UniProtKB/Swiss-Prot annotation:
GO terms for biological process: 1-deoxy-D-xylulose 5-phosphate biosynthetic process; glyceraldehyde-3-phosphate metabolic process; terpenoid biosynthetic process; thiamine biosynthetic process. SMART domains: Transket_pyr. Catalyzes the acyloin condensation reaction between C atoms 2 and 3 of pyruvate and glyceraldehyde 3-phosphate to yield 1-deoxy-D-xylulose-5-phosphate (DXP). NCBIfam families: dxs (TIGR00204), PRK05444.2-2 (NF003933). It is an enzyme of class 2 (transferase). PROSITE patterns: TRANSKETOLASE_1, TRANSKETOLASE_2. It catalyses: D-glyceraldehyde 3-phosphate + pyruvate + H(+) = 1-deoxy-D-xylulose 5-phosphate + CO2. Mg(2+) binds at D156, N185. PANTHER family: 1-D-DEOXYXYLULOSE 5-PHOSPHATE SYNTHASE-RELATED (PTHR43322), 1-DEOXY-D-XYLULOSE-5-PHOSPHATE SYNTHASE, CHLOROPLASTIC (PTHR43322:SF5). This is 1-deoxy-D-xylulose-5-phosphate synthase. Its cofactor is Mg(2+); thiamine diphosphate. Homodimer.
């Protein structure tokens, strides 16, 4: 069925009848096709209003409908890897009425979330976790003597991460029934699919084939060893002829079925039904081929298939692009790195499947031979960068803060312990807005700051970011890192190339008295606003841009402690970061013994919910008014007042 173009308000005659997946279990194929069309229209309309991940969900609309039609969710556990593609799933599982709140303050998450619905048995946001979680659920089911199915849906991109293969290796040996659906939406694995492949996949997944296969194997045991091996080789050869491409999965212990057309219900439904009803204990890999952005021509025509988009016009697909007041930090990083690479051919760049998100697509356009996209493989990316560093290159490993967490052992063991001069460009530092807690860059200062002999820079604006890049290039005797947030800078004038900063030295932005505000990172603008407000009240604080989280500018910090009554530290990181290191310094030097009042302002010890970044920071007191309130409370009370 070819859906009409996505224009106007979607007709929802069938979707209006669906409040849960149970309502679609008796639908005919024709009704399922119509329902899929309506789900796509609902999704397009919702994402045009909220922004979000559109292309992946459009690509799995038929698969989502088919899964909820065949399987008894939520009793049967359905786990979506990453969660980018789960919007149709949300629409069908009782959340349709809240789709326009998605990624908004107080609204639905942009990913699956256990606290949001019983149909989300496992939360996500990062990739390649679904098979591990599904196997855990399958083993738990067996231990409890239950009979429900467990299904994991994972994309071909997520299959580039090692955890997926670790999980498959374990699953192949565990002996628990598990269904893994490989959603191949880039044609990167599968050959063209068609009726023959669908017919053979239906055959391979059928109970009769399974029974015949077991019978042949049982009879083969009665034959002499040489003939038994020949029968096994013949069976493997025959399966390879009909399945085409499943050898790796078979070697890992999976029963491979596919590839089949993920947009054709006549192909999907019988195979899924066979897998649902199978009593085989071997895990199964079902390979489906889909088209990202399916059903919305602007998405199908776009290079990124509308993977992640802001608000857009439904009729034209034109994205709303508010006029930027300044370039984004990501684009400034790319500009700075290109400028350094122009004069130093040892500068190379590494990304873990995020060239566009990190700005390395621009670097790659200019220096393709010096740009390495290693896939969703942060652990490998870090150690690969370490290897480059041993040979005299200057690797910049550009990874989102929340994704760098996945490679912590490699950072510590492979890079920092060996003092290899890898440069970590940590994008999306601090709170990130609509993507919420799964993507927030809250912890990098805490988990990097405890490592010996690493330089950690936190630029306060886009010009400082260019200086951080230049400084990182100059550091050849140890690893370094610099962190910067999502979004645009403050609009400061930029030079063509950054300048090298003195290591571990901050700068006094404004001299004052009584109160010192020691800011690290891009909260400096809010610190200066707070200083203006306090000055209007007759109190002129000193404002300092720390610049370095490690090493600290001990001389400057101790001077601030001697000359002020109150010291406020401000950072876009969790407890255990900059403020904690400053307090440790002050305590160890006896600087707290004479009554100095220190108040660390950091991210609170909770996961901050998704919302607009400005609102997120306002709620936790990390804006100008929060700083002012903390200063006034501290001056007005003898006892400790800590803002959270």
């Amino acid at each position: 069925m070819t859906p009409p173009p996505a224009t106007g308000k979607p007709s929802s005659s069938l979707l209006d009848r669906v409040s849960s997946p149970a309502d679609i279990r008796d639908f005919s194929i024709e009704e399922l096709e119509q329902l899929t069309y309506e789900v796509r229209q609902e999704m397009i309309q919702s994402v045009s209003f909220t922004g979000g991940h559109l292309g992946a969900g459009l690509g799995v609309a038929e698969l989502t409908v088919a899964l909820h039609h065949i399987f008894d969710t939520p009793r049967d556990r359905l786990i979506w890897d990453v969660g980018h593609q789960a919007y149709p799933h949300k629409i069908l599982t009782g959340r349709r009425g809240r789709m326009r709140t998605m990624r908004q303050g107080g609204g639905l998450s942009g990913f699956t979330r256990r606290s949001e619905s019983e149909y989300d048995p496992f939360g996500a946001g990062h990739s390649s976790t679904s098979i591990s979680a599904a196997l855990g659920m399958a083993v738990a089911r067996d231990l409890k003597g239950a009979t429900n199915n467990v299904i994991a849906v994972i994309g071909d991109g997520a299959m580039s991460a090692g955890q997926a293969y670790e999980a498959m290796n374990n699953a192949g040996a565990a002996g628990s029934r598990l269904i893994v659906i490989l959603n191949d939406n880039d044609m990167s694995i599968a050959p063209p699919v068609g009726a023959l492949s669908a017919h053979l996949s239906r055959l391979l997944s059928s109970p009769s084939y399974h029974s015949l296969r077991h019978l042949v194997k049982d009879l083969a045991h009665l034959l002499p060893p040489s003939l038994e091996r020949a029968v096994g080789r013949a069976e493997e050869y025959a399966r390879g002829m009909v399945s085409g491409g499943g050898t790796l999965f078979e070697e890992l212990g999976f029963y491979y079925v596919g590839p089949i057309d993920g947009h054709n219900f006549e192909h999907l439904l019988p195979v899924l039904k066979n897998l649902r009803d199978s009593d085989d204990t071997k895990p199964v890999m079902l390979h489906v081929v889909t088209k990202k952005g399916r059903g919305y021509p602007p998405a199908e025509a776009a290079a990124d298939k509308y993977h992640g988009v802001g608000r857009f016009d439904v009729l034209t697909g034109q994205l709303e692009k508010p006029k930027a007041n300044a370039p984004s930090y990501t684009s400034v990083f790319a500009k700075a790195l290109i400028a350094e690479a122009e004069v130093d051919d040892r500068v190379v760049a590494i990304t873990a499947a995020m060239p566009g998100g990190t700005g390395l697509d621009k670097f790659g356009d200019r220096f393709p031979a010096r740009t390495f996209d290693v896939g969703i493989a942060e652990q490998h990316a870090v150690t690969f960068a370490g290897g480059l560093a041993t040979e005299g290159f200057k690797p910049f490993c550009a990874i989102y803060s929340s994704f760098l967490q996945r490679a912590y052992d490699q950072v510590q063991h492979d890079v920092v312990l060996q003092k290899l001069p890898v440069r970590f460009a940590i994008d999306r530092a601090g709170l990130v807005g609509a993507d919420g807690a799964t993507h927030a860059g809250s912890y990098d200062m805490a988990f990097l700051g405890c490592l010996p002999d690493i330089v950690i820079m936190c630029p306060s604006d886009e010009a400082d970011l260019m200086h951080a890049v230049a400084t990182a290039v100059s550091i050849d005797d140890r690893p370094s890192a610099f962190r910067y947030p999502r979004g645009e800078g403050v609009g400061i004038e930029l030079s063509e190339r950054g300048s090298v900063m003195p290591i571990g030295k901050g700068r006094v932005v404004r001299e004052g008295n009584r109160v010192a505000i020691l800011s690290l990172g891009t909260r400096l603008a809010e610190a200066l606003k707070a200083a203006d407000e306090l000055a209007a009240r007759g109190l002129a604080p000193t404002v300092v841009d720390a610049r370095f989280m490690k090493p600290l500018d001990e001389e400057l910090i101790l001077r601030l402690a001697r000359e002020h009554e109150v010291l406020i530290t401000v950072e876009e990181g969790s407890v255990g970061g900059f403020g904690s290191h400053v307090l440790h310094l002050l305590a160890s030097k006896g600087a707290l013994d004479n009554g100095l009042k220190v108040r660390p302002l950091a991210l609170p010890d909770v996961f901050v919910e998704h919302d607009a970044p400005a609102i997120q920071y306002e709620k936790i007191g990390l804006n100008a008014s929060g700083i002012v309130a903390t200063v006034l409370a501290t001056l007005g009370e003898a006892r400790s007042v800590v803002s959270a």
